[in-house]
């Protein structure tokens, strides 16, 4: 800055605080406010300077501007900065918060104001970043006094509406992220996730991920070092799924925000806007396409478990359909005793659901295993 050139160093900052303390109204709190305040090296520099000012009675709080983007910073860095600052001051303000829809961040005055339509992928990334940030801020609620957004709507933002940075859109209507910020679930903030994860029973042979734990959380791992974003369609909170984060080795990992409903779930990956199946999971036909599948442990899973009992057969048959003028396929379950005598059995026809196909009842629904178990227990007559 010009002041640094005049003074030859940053000592002008202390003079500013001295004059402010001397001439400001009594009781006025003095804050040091800066951008990129989460970066470890800069966090240390701010900490060291604030420590000297605190020892001289010149500072009351620290302001973190909060000009972030959908890709960063990591909430681990923000959490570490808040933790470090809170050892010096008891008042921290988030002073200029916005999360833009590109890779730029910080308080620089040169930035991109133009852009196309905001994709649903980017909206999901922004919602996740806001949710993660406010979870960290709530963790430090004893020292974070307030959060100030850097204007009301995208129309008014210094970044421009195309950067989509604020909770209100350019027409002053609240985005979904507004509700995510406001209607958080305190129970999730304090939830303790058990680290008893094990591979899903529906994984490809030899694959460790995805994983599930005894509480119903799901954890995912995707190796895509050159990707900019990876989203799993399975998740909670109406945020479009679970956003994975890349570690230092270029591996994307993430855990669902909370326990999933028990039983079978379809899901897919969205990598940089493209839709893919998870290479670690088996595929199942649903939603009119082959999707990845995961099984969340259920309290009644014994009902459809593979047991050491006599098993029937599931046979594939083809037939000609006059109504559709096509050859069709069906699967027929026959009980373990079928064919051993001349006994005739009643027929029950099951139609698959919308978007699924004839494999669903046995693959996803385990109908054949349910029948095997009920017959073995004498609870049903084949």
Residue ranges and their predicted role:
Residues 2-10, 19, 77-93, 97-188:
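Aromatic-rich peripheral "rim/lid" segments of glycoside hydrolase catalytic domains that contact
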Residues 10-19, 36-52, 75-82, 132-133, ...:
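Alpha-helical scaffolding within the catalytic cores
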Residues 14-43, 93-96, 146-152:
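Aromatic-lined carbohydrate-recognition surfaces of secreted/lumenal glycan-active proteins
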Residues 28, 32-34, 47-75, 79-111:
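Aromatic- and acid-rich polysaccharide-binding/catalytic face
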Residues 189-221:
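Extracellular ectodomain segments of secreted/surface proteins
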Residues 211, 219-262, 272-296:
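Aromatic-rich carbohydrate-binding modules that target alpha-glucans
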Residues 211-214, 218-221, 245-246, 287-341:
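N-terminal cap/lid segment of alpha/beta-hydrolase-fold proteins
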Residues 338-382:
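Short substrate-entry loop that stabilizes the transition state in hydrolases
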């Amino acid at each position: 800055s010009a002041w640094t050139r005049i003074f030859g160093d940053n000592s002008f900052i202390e003079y500013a605080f001295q004059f402010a303390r001397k001439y400001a109204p009594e009781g006025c709190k003095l804050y040091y406010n800066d951008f990129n305040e989460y970066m470890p090296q800069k966090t240390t520099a701010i900490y060291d300077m604030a420590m000297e000012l605190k020892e001289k009675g010149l500072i009351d709080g620290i302001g973190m501007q909060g000009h972030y983007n959908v890709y960063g910073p990591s909430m681990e860095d923000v959490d570490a900065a808040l933790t470090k600052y809170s050892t010096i001051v008891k008042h921290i303000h988030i002073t200029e918060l916005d999360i833009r829809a590109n890779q730029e961040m910080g308080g620089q005055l040169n930035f991109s104001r133009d852009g196309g339509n905001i994709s649903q992928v980017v909206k999901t990334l922004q919602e996740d970043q806001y949710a993660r940030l406010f979870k960290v801020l709530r963790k430090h609620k004893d020292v974070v006094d307030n959060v100030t957004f850097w204007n009301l709507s995208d129309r008014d933002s210094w970044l421009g509406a195309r950067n989509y940075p604020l909770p209100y859109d350019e027409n002053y209507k609240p985005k979904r992220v507004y509700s995510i910020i406001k209607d958080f679930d305190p129970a999730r903030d304090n939830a303790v996730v058990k680290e008893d994860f094990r591979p899903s029973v529906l994984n490809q042979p030899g694959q460790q991920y995805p994983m599930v734990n005894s509480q119903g959380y799901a954890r995912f791992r995707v190796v895509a070092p050159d990707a900019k974003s990876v989203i799993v369609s399975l998740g909670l909170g109406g945020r479009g799924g679970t956003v994975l984060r890349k570690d230092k080795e270029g591996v994307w990992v993430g855990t669902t925000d909370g326990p999933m409903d028990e039983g079978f779930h379809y899901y897919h990956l969205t990598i940089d806007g493209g839709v893919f199946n998870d290479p670690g999971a088996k595929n199942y036909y649903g939603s009119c396409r082959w999707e990845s599948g995961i099984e969340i442990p259920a309290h009644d899973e014994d009902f459809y478990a593979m047991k050491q009992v006599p098993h029937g057969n599931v046979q594939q048959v083809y037939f000609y359909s006059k109504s559709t003028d096509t050859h069709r396929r069906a699967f027929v379950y026959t009980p373990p005793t079928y064919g051993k005598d001349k006994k005739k059995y009643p027929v029950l026809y099951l139609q698959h659901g919308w978007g699924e196909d004839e494999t669903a009842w046995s693959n996803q629904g385990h109908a054949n295993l349910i029948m095997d178990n009920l017959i073995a227990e004498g609870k049903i007559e084949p």
